[in-house]
């Protein structure tokens, strides 16, 4: 999982990417292609 300063660009990389916020940490999750996982915060 990558830690990124900007997640907006990652969200547009794949159509199944979803942004999820848990306890103030923002995650990009992708069920079909897990290599797009990222987190911020």
UniProtKB/Swiss-Prot annotation:
The lineage of its organism: Bacteria, Pseudomonadati, Pseudomonadota, Alphaproteobacteria, Caulobacterales. GO terms for molecular function: structural constituent of ribosome. This is Large ribosomal subunit protein bL36. PROSITE patterns: RIBOSOMAL_L36. One of its GO terms (cellular component) is ribosome. Belongs to the bacterial ribosomal protein bL36 family. The keyword Ribonucleoprotein applies. Pfam families: Ribosomal_L36. The gene is rpmJ. Keywords: Ribonucleoprotein, Ribosomal protein.
């Amino acid at each position: 999982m990558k830690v990124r300063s900007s997640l907006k660009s990652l969200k547009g990389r794949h159509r199944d990417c979803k942004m999820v916020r848990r306890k103030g940490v923002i995650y990009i999750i992708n069920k079909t292609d897990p290599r797009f996982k990222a987190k911020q915060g």
